[in-house]
UniProtKB/Swiss-Prot annotation:
Residues at which thiamine diphosphate binds: 62
Family annotation (InterPro entries): THDP-binding, Transketo_C/PFOR_II, Transketolase-like_Pyr-bd, Transketolase_C
GO biological process: branched-chain amino acid catabolic process; response to nutrient
PANTHER family: PYRUVATE DEHYDROGENASE E1 COMPONENT BETA SUBUNIT, PYRUVATE DEHYDROGENASE E1 COMPONENT SUBUNIT BETA
Gene encoding the protein: pdhB
Required cofactor names: thiamine diphosphate
Species for this entry: Mycoplasma genitalium (strain ATCC 33530 / DSM 19775 / NCTC 10195 / G37) (Mycoplasmoides genitalium)
A GO term for molecular function: pyruvate dehydrogenase (acetyl-transferring) activity
Enzyme Commission designation: 1.2.4.1
Enzyme class: oxidoreductase
Function: The pyruvate dehydrogenase complex catalyzes the overall conversion of pyruvate to acetyl-CoA and CO(2). It contains multiple copies of three enzymatic components: pyruvate dehydrogenase (E1), dihydrolipoamide acetyltransferase (E2) and lipoamide dehydrogenase (E3).
Full protein name: Pyruvate dehydrogenase E1 component subunit beta
Keywords: Oxidoreductase, Pyruvate, Thiamine pyrophosphate
Catalysed transformations (reactions): N(6)-[(R)-lipoyl]-L-lysyl-[protein] + pyruvate + H(+) = N(6)-[(R)-S(8)-acetyldihydrolipoyl]-L-lysyl-[protein] + CO2
Length: 326
């Protein structure tokens, strides 16, 4: 199998190219997603290759984009809907939550809505309001949706192609700060990464760290070559937020007895709370110390230069690890 060296944005482009090539029912659209190739150039060259009937531009109307996707999916197509930033998805939530997520149940299985909604998320570009949101917990709690967030090129391509194959809607979050952060060798051919399976990044016996998406790059560097090296840390990349891989996390916590959850999202009512609650409910007697979390703060994302205070977590992670290992 041939290999290619790509960053996350190139892996995503390659995945969409393969999906469009393999299945004539796959269509792609969004604001600037056609001729311009997307604001981050994720769809670069795809309209030129597949034509404007399969790859096209939309006006700034996210509710309409999502509604068109639901109808097209019910009608037999496989739409890829690009919402330019996750913070722009609020108008689309009605169509996604009320129709896309419920159509299988509403029709008693007669209809499904196999669409993929792509959303660049999180910090990294020091932009204005609504450009740096972390909304995965909102989508993850909606029954009928799958919510994924890759952190590297291999998983970006594999999870996206798995999302294309899903008979139900998938919310595909893309960490902007990782789009061009590094390159990785991945297969050039078609492959999938199973939705709902976490990735065990490093094995250890002292502490379990669970994370996903934009924080994984820094955590891997800390564990393999930084201040957290040789501390016995087991690092888990969830990859899928919903349904999340409880078994992998539980098996690790049973071994280490300590848990730290790290996310870029705010602290309250989010995935970090769900993971810690589940572990505490089911594995209380295995815990040597109370689980901790390092997250963003419960505030509106700061603008421009203030962004780093919300999203830079390395020092706080090191402090939390030292506290848990005392």
């Amino acid at each position: 199998m041939s290999k290619i060296q790509v960053n996350n944005i190139e892996a995503l482009n390659n995945a969409m190219d393969l999906a469009l090539e393999r299945d004539q029912n796959v269509v792609l659209y969004g604001q600037d997603a056609g001729f311009e190739g997307g604001v981050f150039r994720a769809t670069k060259g795809l309209q030129q290759k597949y034509g404007s009937e399969r790859v096209w531009d939309c006006p700034i109307a996210e509710n309409s984009m999502a509604g068109i996707g639901v109808g097209a999916a019910i009608g037999g197509l496989k739409p890829i809907v690009e919402i330019q930033f996750s913070g722009f998805s609020f108008p689309a939530m009605f169509q996604i939550f009320v129709h896309a997520a419920r159509i299988r149940n509403r029709s008693r299985g007669v209809y499904t809505a196999p669409l993929v909604v792509r959303m660049p998320m999180g910090g990294g570009i020091k932009a204005l309001e609504h450009h740096s949101e972390t909304l995965e917990a909102i989508y993850a709690q909606i029954a009928g949706l799958k919510t994924v967030m890759p952190s590297n090129p291999y998983d970006t391509k594999g999870l996206f192609l798995a999302a294309i194959e899903s008979p139900d809607p998938v919310i595909f979050f893309e960490p902007k700060k990782l789009y061009r952060a590094f390159r990785q060798e991945i297969p050039s051919d078609y492959y999938t990464v199973p939705i709902g399976e976490a990735n065990l990044i490093s094995e250890g016996s002292e502490l379990t760290i669970v994370s996903y998406g934009p924080t994984m790059f820094d955590l891997i560097n800390l564990v393999y070559s930084g201040e957290l090296k040789d501390k016995g840390i087991e690092l888990i990349d969830l990859r899928t937020i919903s349904p999340w891989d409880k078994q992998t996390v539980f098996n690790s916590v049973k071994k280490t007895g300590r848990l730290l959850v790290v996310t870029e999202a705010v602290k309250s009512f989010t995935t970090s709370a769900e993971i810690i609650t589940s572990v505490t409910e089911e594995l209380f007697t295995y815990l040597k110390k109370a689980p901790q979390r390092v997250t963003g703060f419960d505030i509106v994302v700061p603008l421009a230069r203030g962004e780093k205070y919300q999203f830079e977590i390395n020092a706080r992670v090191i402090d939390a690890v030292n506290q848990l290992l005392k």
